[in-house]
């Protein structure tokens, strides 16, 4: 029985131990399974992280590589642009140097030679007429043209490498033509390099094909390439860059103006040289006459015979000391020759730097006189200098300036008028507006007065009128401005002289007669303050009649403000407005006189004491000074004349 009890105890213990082991094994298996799952999860997370890091690093390397490529490309572009800019600047410098060395002078210096006359002891001979030698240059083209064509090669090949030069020339021309096509298509970045490459090849052939046309061709495209480079460097919008055709027209206009300025400078130099030589001749002649007079006076001191005057106006001086009884005579003709040598024998030479065109039926001396009336543009008057007169400026812009800048647009019914009249009370800027038109329109401008077309010789006035219109037609587009036109084209009557009548008739015929052509670009602009005195035929030809009246309130305010610019004054804005209101009826000239008189008021108060004062110690111009000046400076235009102008404007005026 004990044995059975022990045996059952052992069995129970073994079973319990087995159960415990099973439980432990189950627990261990559970934990092992959990550990296996975490391990797998950790392995998968690690793999995903590695792939993610790999893609991130690859993307970063790609971005860095792209950035490096961008900056490298940008550096290459900047380097190429720098090289092109340096190459272009070098070509410009070389081209200017070649022009200075190889270009032949266009004019030769005018020299005036005076041959000294040998005089005997008995007779004073007439001085010889001065001889002048002049050379002329070709006149600038009258209308803007396209750039000069590439000059053709010589027919004879003088060197072995002429074929290579011809191929190089053709290649350069092909590159420039391609660049021109890109230029017209607004592909400016691409055309600059082709321009530079083509010009570089042309400049390499300078020694073989050096001519004016060749230089002009290179100069035009050099200027175009330089202009495009500067505009692109500034970041200008492509549509705002001047296109090829407009640039060509502007280049030709500037080229013509440059030649005209050079001609005027050379004309002034030659005229001064001629005057100096003429004065030298006169001084020599006068010294010779004085010597003869001194000899005659010394002889007359011992003379016992009085001086007698004969009907032939010859003064005879007899000297008893003369061994052979010779008479020393000075005729009045010889003496008058000395006085009138400037007007008769010594004719004004033609300007050597201005070409004298060969015009059928026109004397060259008349043409020379007319060409001296071409206005000089050294001191130009611009639109901004003309204060107020907005309606007048707008009308002139439409009638004069725009048609000359775009002649292709203003054709047919848009063709500009051939005659224009500025009328109104004096002192309101009619002449100043004409000067502004002369500068802004960029055309040949003739400033004519009545003295320019009158002569003491019968028939010369009509010849001068004919020469004026012929020269203006030759240099068209051009403007003929006649100040105080009423002095030339007053109403014809039976009481006037025959010469005046012929002169008016010739002006009207040349203005718009049977020989005139509708395609001529010659505008006649007149200014007057007596429009009622003009002839009816002249009014018919002066189609556009613009009234330049007294300044209005706003214009008077602008004029006063413009005159006070740069002056030391204490006027407030309200006081300036008050001045503009109280000056109703004042012309532009009256306002200028008023401001000048007011500026003198502080100096009047100082008197002689101003010599000891500094400039900044002089008192400022005050409103009180203007009040004192208003008592002295009155309007110069009467109300009656103003009413007559307004009445004439309502009847015949345009605006």
From Swiss-Prot:
**Could you say which enzyme class this protein belongs to?**
isomerase
Intramembrane residue numbers? 59-79
What is a single molecular function from GO for this protein?
Answer: ATP hydrolysis activity
Q: What segments bear the compositional bias annotation Pro residues?
A: 141-151
Residue sites binding ATP per the record: 424-431
The species is Dictyostelium discoideum
Q: Which ranges does the record list as Cytoplasmic topological domains?
A: 1-58, 80-655
Q: Name one Pfam family in it.
A: MIT
Q: Which InterPro entries match?
A: AAA+_ATPase, AAA_lid_3, ATPase_AAA_core, ATPase_AAA_CS, MIT_dom, MIT_dom_sf, MT-severing_AAA_ATPase, P-loop_NTPase
Q: How does it assemble?
A: Homohexamer. The homohexamer is stabilized by ATP-binding. The homohexamer may adopt a ring conformation through which microtubules pass prior to being severed. Interacts with microtubules.
Give the CC-aspect GO terms.
centrosome; cytoplasm; microtubule; microtubule cytoskeleton; mitotic spindle pole; nuclear outer membrane; spindle midzone
Positions of the UniProt region annotated as Disordered: 102-151, 261-325
Instruction: State what protein this is by name.
Output: Spastin
Tell me which UniProt keywords the record has, alphabetically.
ATP-binding, Cytoplasm, Cytoskeleton, Isomerase, Membrane, Microtubule, Nucleotide-binding
EC assignment: the record states: 5.6.1.1
Domain annotation MIT: ranges? 169-232
Question: Which membrane topology term applies here?
Answer: Peripheral membrane protein
What is the organism lineage in this UniProt record?
Eukaryota, Amoebozoa, Evosea, Eumycetozoa, Dictyostelia
Reactions accelerated catalytically: n ATP + n H2O + a microtubule = n ADP + n phosphate + (n+1) alpha/beta tubulin heterodimers
């Amino acid at each position: 029985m004990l044995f059975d009890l022990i045996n059952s105890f052992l069995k129970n213990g073994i079973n319990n131990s087995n159960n415990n082991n099973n439980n432990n094994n189950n627990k261990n298996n559970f934990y092992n399974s959990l550990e296996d799952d975490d391990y797998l999860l950790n392995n998968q997370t690690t793999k995903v992280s590695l792939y993610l890091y790999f893609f991130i690093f690859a993307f970063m390397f790609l971005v860095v590589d792209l950035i490096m490529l961008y900056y490298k490309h940008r550096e290459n572009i900047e380097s190429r642009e720098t090289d092109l800019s340096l190459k272009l600047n070098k070509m410009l410098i070389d081209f200017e140097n070649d022009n200075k060395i190889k270009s032949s002078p266009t004019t030769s210096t005018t020299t005036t030679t005076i041959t000294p006359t040998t005089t005997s002891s008995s007779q004073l001979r007439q001085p010889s007429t001065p001889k002048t030698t002049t050379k002329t240059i070709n006149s600038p083209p009258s209308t803007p043209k396209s750039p000069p064509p590439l000059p053709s090669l010589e027919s004879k090949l003088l060197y072995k490498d002429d074929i290579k030069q011809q191929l190089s020339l053709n290649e350069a021309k092909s590159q420039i033509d391609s660049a021109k096509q890109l230029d017209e298509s607004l592909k400016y970045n691409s055309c600059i390099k082709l321009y530079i490459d083509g010009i570089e090849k042309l400049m390499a052939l300078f020694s073989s094909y050096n001519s004016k046309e060749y230089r002009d061709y290179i100069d035009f495209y050099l200027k175009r390439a330089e202009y495009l480079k500067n505009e692109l460097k500034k970041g200008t919008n492509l549509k705002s860059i001047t296109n090829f055709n407009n640039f060509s027209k502007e280049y030709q206009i500037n080229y013509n103006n440059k030649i005209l300025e050079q001609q005027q400078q050379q004309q002034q130099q030659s005229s001064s040289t001629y005057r100096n030589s003429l004065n030298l001749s006169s001084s020599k002649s006068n010294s010779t006459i004085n010597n003869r007079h001194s000899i005659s006076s010394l002889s007359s001191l011992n003379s016992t015979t009085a001086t007698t005057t004969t009907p032939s106006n010859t003064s005879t001086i007899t000297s008893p000391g003369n061994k052979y009884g010779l008479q020393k005579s000075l005729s009045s003709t010889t003496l008058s020759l000395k006085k009138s040598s400037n007007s008769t024998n010594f004719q004004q030479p033609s300007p050597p730097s201005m070409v004298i065109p060969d015009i059928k039926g026109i004397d060259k001396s008349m043409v020379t006189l007319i060409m001296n009336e071409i206005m000089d543009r050294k001191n130009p008057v611009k639109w901004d200098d003309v204060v107020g007169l907005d309606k007048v400026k707008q009308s002139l812009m439409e009638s004069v300036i725009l048609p000359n800048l775009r002649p292709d647009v203003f054709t047919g019914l848009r063709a500009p008028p051939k005659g224009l009249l500025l009328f109104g009370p004096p002192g309101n800027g009619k002449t100043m507006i004409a000067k502004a038109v002369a500068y802004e329109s960029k055309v040949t401008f003739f400033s004519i007065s009545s003295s320019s077309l009158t002569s003491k010789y019968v028939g010369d006035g009509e010849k001068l009128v004919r020469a004026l219109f012929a020269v203006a037609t030759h240099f068209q587009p051009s403007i003929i401005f006649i100040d105080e036109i009423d002095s030339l084209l007053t109403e014809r009557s039976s009481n006037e002289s025959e010469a005046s009548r012929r002169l008016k008739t010739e002006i009207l015929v040349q203005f718009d007669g049977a020989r005139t052509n509708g395609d001529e670009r010659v505008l006649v602009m007149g200014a007057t303050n007596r429009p009622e005195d003009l002839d009816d035929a002249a009014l018919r030809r002066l189609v556009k009649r613009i009234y330049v009246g007294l300044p209005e309130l706003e214009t008077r305010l602008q004029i006063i403000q413009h005159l006070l610019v740069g002056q030391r004054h204490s006027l407030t804005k309200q006081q300036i407005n008050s001045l503009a209101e109280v000056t109703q009826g004042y012309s532009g000239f009256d306002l200028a006189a008023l401001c000048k008189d007011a500026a003198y008021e502080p100096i009047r108060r100082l008197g002689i004491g101003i010599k000891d004062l500094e400039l900044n110690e002089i008192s400022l111009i005050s409103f009180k000074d203007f009040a004192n000046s208003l008592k002295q400076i009155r309007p110069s235009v009467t109300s009656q004349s103003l009413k007559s102008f307004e009445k004439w404007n309502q009847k015949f005026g345009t605006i």
